[in-house]
């Protein structure tokens, strides 16, 4: 349960949702606890006390002294960067003493291994990527349910993995399949996690301050794959394809790709455009049509004997209820993951047609006078906004800006030039966005509030356009969180609707 330690003394750093879950899990299994948080009274302190947990609490700045006094295991909450000025010396001190540093995902992996010794053998699906994680995770969970499996969805999507596992154990209802949304923060402190199937949806700049650079961020994403994990890879993303196993390796893990073009290799997925219809398709080797659906180690043989590939139509992309080409890619990834753990195709395709999407993720909240109002407040990085613009593939008035987290905004220029009628700029990093978009030829306007930006965008939009809130930035410079930003956007659209004599 805790590596080679029975009931170690654990230092839990950070008492957010994940830290609270770790503390409760460790206490449940007899560990002694020291809990530290930079806040003197973190909100979850009362919840931990109410749970009847015996622990020592230390509030205030972190210091290496926290690992003194018999600490045998350090648990790091995902919001805390090991590179942070106050945390790096503590982490270094722990490692110098040979004290393991785990995050919640490693505790979860160790727990599954311990349960496995008693015969519990669930399938585990893991989803990571800069954008699209929550949609793909929710959709994969639904698909597994439609295939008749008892499913637990947890991780970055909430609830915490250890809380969900505790609930399942207490209810004597352990799931057949775990579907986990995992952030780079969670993966960074994982060591033995090895899911049955996993995907990296995409890798673009995000959280560079936390990881110290893009290479470290991408490497953290790659920790989603264990030695035998089926790798579901986005072939349209060169950074993702760096994790493709070498074709010549005899012991290479299985791999399958998805993308927005036609797939060319047996078992891969993509889009076929025919007579004005885009189809979700699977590539099938005609000579091995009766082979199992799960991808095989085939790349080396294909080089010598190219297969006779046919494209099997799965469903029209327009039959999906989630809009945009990026969501077609998410759907293909979810389907590929479910197939990779051996689930039958028919119920999965029904699930794809059923899924309605997640709030604040390219969500059309209204259509007024032929103009779509689209809430993509969850689009907190450049890659998300590029995906929203290219995915919607319609003329748009974009509302963007906020806390840019040190990102390079230059990749926005091409899609803005292609799709945008105008861009409304808000928030702290509006000047940086203006500089990046200055040569696009698209009108740019600064606004002090989101409400003003929505009104200006509405006045400019033409029938067939979208007014798209996709900020490419975090929200905390102006709002409590991205959901609060979405609420303000919706309220502004509601006001416009009322003036037009209608409601949302």
From Swiss-Prot:
Enzyme class: ligase
GO molecular function, one term: ATP binding
Entry-linked InterPro entries: Mur-like_cat_sf, Mur_ligase_C, Mur_ligase_C_dom_sf, Mur_ligase_cen, MurD
Subcellular location: Cytoplasm
Native source organism of the sequence: Burkholderia pseudomallei (strain 668)
Gene name per UniProt: murD
Protein name, as recorded: UDP-N-acetylmuramoylalanine--D-glutamate ligase
Annotated ATP binding sites: 129-135
Keyword hit for Cell membrane: no
GO biological process: cell division; cell wall organization; peptidoglycan biosynthetic process; regulation of cell shape
Swiss-Prot/TrEMBL keywords: ATP-binding, Cell cycle, Cell division, Cell shape, Cell wall biogenesis/degradation, Cytoplasm, Ligase, Nucleotide-binding, Peptidoglycan synthesis
């Amino acid at each position: 349960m805790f590596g080679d330690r029975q009931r170690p003394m654990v230092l839990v750093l950070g008492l957010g949702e994940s830290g609270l879950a770790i503390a409760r899990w460790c206490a449940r299994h007899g560990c002694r606890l020291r809990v530290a948080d930079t806040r003197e009274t973190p909100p979850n302190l009362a919840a931990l006390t109410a749970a009847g947990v015996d622990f020592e609490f230390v509030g205030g700045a972190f210091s290496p002294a926290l690992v003194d006094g018999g600490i045998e295991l350090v648990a790091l909450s995902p919001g805390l960067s090991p590179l942070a000025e106050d945390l790096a010396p503590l982490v270094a001190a722990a490692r110098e003493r040979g004290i393991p540093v785990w995050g919640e995902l490693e505790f979860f992996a160790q727990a599954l291994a311990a349960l496995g010794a008693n015969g519990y053998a669930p399938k585990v699906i893991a989803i990571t990527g800069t954008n699209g994680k929550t949609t793909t995770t929710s959709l994969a969970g639904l698909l597994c349910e439609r295939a008749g499996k008892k499913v637990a969805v947890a991780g970055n999507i909430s609830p915490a993995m250890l809380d969900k596992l505790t609930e399942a154990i207490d209810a004597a209802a352990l799931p057949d399949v775990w579907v986990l949304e995992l952030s780079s923060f969670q993966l960074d402190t994982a060591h033995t996690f090895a899911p049955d199937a996993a995907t990296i949806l995409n890798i673009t700049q995000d959280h560079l301050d936390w990881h110290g650079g893009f290479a470290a961020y991408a490497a953290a994403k790659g920790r989603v794959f264990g030695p035998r994990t089926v790798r579901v890879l986005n072939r349209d993303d060169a950074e993702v394809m760096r994790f493709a196993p070498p074709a010549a390796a005899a012991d290479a893990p299985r791999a399958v790709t998805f993308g927005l073009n036609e797939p060319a290799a047996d078992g891969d997925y993509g889009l076929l455009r025919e007579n004005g219809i885009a189809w979700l398709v699977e590539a099938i080797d005609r000579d091995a049509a009766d082979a199992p659906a799960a991808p095989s180690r085939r790349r080396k043989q294909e080089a010598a004997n190219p297969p006779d590939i046919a494209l099997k139509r799965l469903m029209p992309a327009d039959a999906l209820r989630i809009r945009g080409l990026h969501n077609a890619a998410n759907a293909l990834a979810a389907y590929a993951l479910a197939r990779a753990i051996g689930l039958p195709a028919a119920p999965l395709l029904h699930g794809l047609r059923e899924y309605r999407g997640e709030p604040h993720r390219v969500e059309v909240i209204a259509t007024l006078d032929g103009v779509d109002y689209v809430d993509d407040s969850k689009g907190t990085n450049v890659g998300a906004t590029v995906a929203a613009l290219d995915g919607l593939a319609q003329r748009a008035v974009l509302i963007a800006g906020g806390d840019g987290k040190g990102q390079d905004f230059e990749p926005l220029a091409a899609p803005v030039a292609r799709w945008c009628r105008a861009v409304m700029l808000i928030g702290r990093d509006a000047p940086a966005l203006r500089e990046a978009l200055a040569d696009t030829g698209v009108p740019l306007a600064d606004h002090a509030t989101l409400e003003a930006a929505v009104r200006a965008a509405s006045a400019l939009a033409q029938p067939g356009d979208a007014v798209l809130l996709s900020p490419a930035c975090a929200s905390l410079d102006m709002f409590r969180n991205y959901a609060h930003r979405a609420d303000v956007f919706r309220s502004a659209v509601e006001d416009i609707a009322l003036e037009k004599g209608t409601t949302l």
